[in-house]
Each structure stands twice: as C-alpha cells, then as structure tokens.
Amino acid sequence: MKLRPLHDRVIVKRNEVELKSAGGIVLTGSAAGKSTRGVVLSVGKGRILDNGSIKKLDVKVGDIVIFNEGYGAKTETINNEEVLILTENDILAIVEK
C-alpha cells in the first residue's frame, strides 16, 4: 500500500532513537523517548489559500526534518513500517547538511 498525502500534509518516517546516553549509559523504556527527527517520504500538493490558489510546500521528499508531534499528528503502519502524517505547520525545521 502507498499513501499520497493531501493538501499541506507530509508523510514522515521517524528516525531511530539513540539508545545510549552521551556518557555511554544504555537507555530503556521512557528514558529512550521517541525521536522528533525524520525523513520526508511524501508531500501533498500544497496549502489552499483563501483566494483558492495553492501554495507549494517548503519541504520536499528526502528532507530530514525536526517536527512537533502535536495534536494533529497521526501515526499509521504501512507495509509494517510506522509513519507519521503531519501538516507542514508541525514541521519546525529542515536539517541542512
């Protein structure tokens, strides 16, 4: 199955969390937390403005992003892989190399 996001939605695959602290301690359970970084897998066509025009998204497929997993974020499992469906507003930054 393949997802195609609508409008200003973005599909992101969350990066794996580092399971060791900076001091080398292995983190488990809630201490490990969930990553707020991921790679953009798919983007919608853009946000519909009040005048009916469409504003293209700033993020693109392949971007590594930092996101806020807030109220509007939806987690789905597609082909045994967990992905997040976010709006572009949930994305806080694009990580540039």
Curated annotation (Swiss-Prot):
<dbReference type="GO" id="GO:0051082">
    <property type="term" value="F:unfolded protein binding"/>
</dbReference>
<protein>
    <recommendedName>
        <fullName>Co-chaperonin GroES</fullName>
    </recommendedName>
</protein>
<keyword id="KW-0143">Chaperone</keyword>
<comment type="function">
    <text>Together with the chaperonin GroEL, plays an essential role in assisting protein folding. The GroEL-GroES system forms a nano-cage that allows encapsulation of the non-native substrate proteins and provides a physical environment optimized to promote and accelerate protein folding. GroES binds to the apical surface of the GroEL ring, thereby capping the opening of the GroEL channel.</text>
</comment>
<dbReference type="GO" id="GO:0051085">
    <property type="term" value="P:chaperone cofactor-dependent protein refolding"/>
</dbReference>
<keyword id="KW-0963">Cytoplasm</keyword>
<comment type="subunit">
    <text>Heptamer of 7 subunits arranged in a ring. Interacts with the chaperonin GroEL.</text>
</comment>
<dbReference type="InterPro" id="IPR011032">
    <property type="entry name" value="GroES-like_sf"/>
</dbReference>
<dbReference type="InterPro" id="IPR020818">
    <property type="entry name" value="Chaperonin_GroES"/>
</dbReference>
<dbReference type="Pfam" id="PF00166">
    <property type="entry name" value="Cpn10"/>
</dbReference>
<dbReference type="GO" id="GO:0044183">
    <property type="term" value="F:protein folding chaperone"/>
</dbReference>
<dbReference type="GO" id="GO:0046872">
    <property type="term" value="F:metal ion binding"/>
</dbReference>
<dbReference type="InterPro" id="IPR018369">
    <property type="entry name" value="Chaprnonin_Cpn10_CS"/>
</dbReference>
<dbReference type="GO" id="GO:0005524">
    <property type="term" value="F:ATP binding"/>
</dbReference>
<comment type="similarity">
    <text>Belongs to the GroES chaperonin family.</text>
</comment>
<dbReference type="GO" id="GO:0051087">
    <property type="term" value="F:protein-folding chaperone binding"/>
</dbReference>
<dbReference type="InterPro" id="IPR037124">
    <property type="entry name" value="Chaperonin_GroES_sf"/>
</dbReference>
<dbReference type="GO" id="GO:0005737">
    <property type="term" value="C:cytoplasm"/>
</dbReference>
